[in-house]
């Protein structure tokens, strides 16, 4: 399946079961895959598939921020339209055109298309219907975005998708006239953990290549691959056989099939490419190549998605403490500061909603690392995961928020670890954030339990987690974490509600203390563990 087909809205009966009265929703974190896009590189032009697609009308109405005075006091916008230039027959420059000689609205490789904008906008509208209209979790009208965390990877389609989803969740009619610009968090690509970053994490690059090679050895000479070659070889360069590591790779073939399937008749491949059996084979092998590492190797999970899962869980823990400092940390504010850092900043009471624009590899990696991706297909465009944090109304009535009086100890580095500690324990388990440094003077001290592994919590800190539950929904389907099925690890009568303590214990096992250090460790060690390390358990 290329495009996610959403289910109908939950009925009142379904809502009463999904959101029981004894629980109160406290925090929602959404990971959303970008919407439909063009292929990341042109392929199969020998079939007549145009290299340039006319599905990006945003290119007709782009704008850039312009400094209009030399004293930095005035800023404006330059509106413009984009056209693509390419090589002509004799290498002279020509304007690229679509299949019907369109010059405007022509897409770049991997660009979010009009349909991708449409489906991510619709996702935001569906989320609004659930969390605003049906559950009254978020307000109908907002004056600022202080309780909302927006984040995206450096890839433009991810940023544009989260912008579209936010617009659907809170359209202009649901924002006050003086609504200030929302903050959207991004990272340097070398520090990006919102997708499995094999380009910047050397050890993860080694692991991913090793598992990809194993996949090639497993499938290249199989009957399934022969079936694909019988269909597609005549379109491959030099009529080569299709293989996991062919050129284009099998995952590249899938990329073009999925992108063409999601768009109009002018950009379609020959019908053989959409053969149902062939697509099922491609999906199965691609999932094996890209995601089997998460199901077999704790190190793979740690380097690929552990930092992200640690961020999600620490935000939950910060929300539980109830002091709002997790919100301040997310947008870079100082608590009790006289400066508000701009309109809509400085009065945070804690993040309630997080929207993160990411990728298919993010979603599958997160679910696989929690033991919740068994038997799943490749995530379609505009798929999403909702991590929902609940608190028991009976428990919350008997507890008050915890306000730690002493800061946590600094995180350990490799040089300060005792010599008897193994490399494994030195890399796992997120410690507290470092103390302030010249490069991060605006950092605030994290809340006491947000960045501490469960094993390091005191009895009183651990008790703070009591009465809180985590539930995961993937494309509106409830997903089950294996560790949460055990007695005492879930809400009585419903195994889909994992205790926050059990959820944190699972995530702690894959959360690196220092991701960059882990990425440059074990470079001479074998890629595969001695035995399969099953995910989703404490």
Language-model features: locations:
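Signature for phosphate-centric chemistry
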Residues: 1-149, 153-354, 358-538
């Amino acid at each position: 399946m290329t495009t996610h087909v959403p289910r109908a809205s939950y009925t009142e009966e379904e809502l009463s079961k999904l959101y029981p009265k004894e629980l109160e929703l406290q925090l929602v974190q959404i990971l959303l895959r970008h919407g439909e896009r063009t292929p990341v590189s042109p392929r199969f032009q020998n079939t007549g598939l145009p290299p340039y697609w006319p599905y990006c009308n945003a290119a007709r109405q782009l704008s850039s921020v312009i400094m209009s005075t030399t004293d930095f006091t005035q800023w404006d916008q330059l509106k413009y339209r984009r056209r693509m230039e390419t090589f002509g027959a004799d290498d002279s420059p020509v304007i690229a055109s679509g299949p019907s000689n369109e010059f405007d609205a022509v897409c770049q490789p991997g660009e979010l298309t009009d349909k991708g904008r449409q489906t991510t906008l619709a996702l935001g509208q569906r989320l609004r219907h659930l969390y605003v209209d049906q559950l009254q979790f978020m307000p109908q009208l907002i004056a600022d975005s202080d309780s909302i965390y927006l984040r995206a990877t450096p890839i433009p389609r991810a940023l544009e998708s989260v912008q579209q989803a936010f617009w659907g969740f809170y359209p202009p009619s649901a924002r006050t006239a003086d609504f200030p610009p929302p903050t959207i968090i991004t990272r340097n690509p070398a520090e990006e953990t919102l997708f499995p970053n094999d380009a910047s994490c050397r050890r993860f690059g080694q692991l991913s290549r090793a598992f990809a090679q194993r996949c090639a050895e497993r499938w290249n000479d199989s009957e399934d691959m022969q079936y694909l070659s019988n269909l597609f070889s005549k379109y491959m360069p030099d009529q080569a056989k299709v293989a996991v590591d062919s050129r284009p790779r099998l995952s590249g073939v899938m990329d073009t099939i999925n992108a063409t399937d999601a768009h109009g008749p002018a950009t379609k491949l020959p019908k053989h490419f959409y053969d149902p059996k062939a697509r099922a084979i491609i999906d199965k092998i691609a999932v094996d190549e890209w995601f089997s590492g998460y199901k077999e190797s704790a190190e793979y999970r740690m380097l690929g998605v552990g930092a992200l899962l640690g961020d999600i869980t620490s935000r939950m823990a910060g929300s539980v403490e109830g002091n709002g400092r997790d919100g301040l940390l997310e947008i870079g504010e100082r608590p009790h500061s006289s400066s508000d850092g701009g309109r809509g900043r400085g009065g945070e009471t804690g993040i309630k909603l997080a929207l993160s624009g990411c990728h298919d590899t993010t979603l599958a990696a997160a679910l696989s690392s929690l033991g919740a991706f068994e038997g799943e297909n490749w995530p379609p465009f505009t798929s999403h995961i909702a991590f929902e944090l609940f608190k028991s109304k009976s428990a919350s009535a008997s507890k008050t928020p915890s306000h730690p009086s002493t800061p946590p100890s600094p995180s350990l580095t490799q040089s300060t670890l005792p010599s008897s500690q193994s490399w494994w324990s030195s890399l796992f388990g997120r410690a507290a954030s470092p103390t302030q440094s010249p490069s991060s003077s605006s950092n605030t001290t994290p809340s006491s339990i947000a960045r501490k592994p469960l094993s390091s919590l005191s009895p009183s800190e651990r008790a703070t987690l009591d009465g809180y539950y985590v539930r995961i929904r993937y494309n509106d389907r409830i997903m089950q974490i294996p560790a949460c099925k055990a007695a005492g690890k879930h809400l009585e009568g419903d195994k889909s509600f994992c205790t926050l303590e059990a959820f944190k214990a699972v995530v702690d096992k894959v959360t690196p203390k220092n991701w960059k250090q882990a990425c440059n460790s074990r470079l001479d060690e074998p890629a595969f563990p001695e035995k399969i390390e099953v995910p989703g358990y404490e």
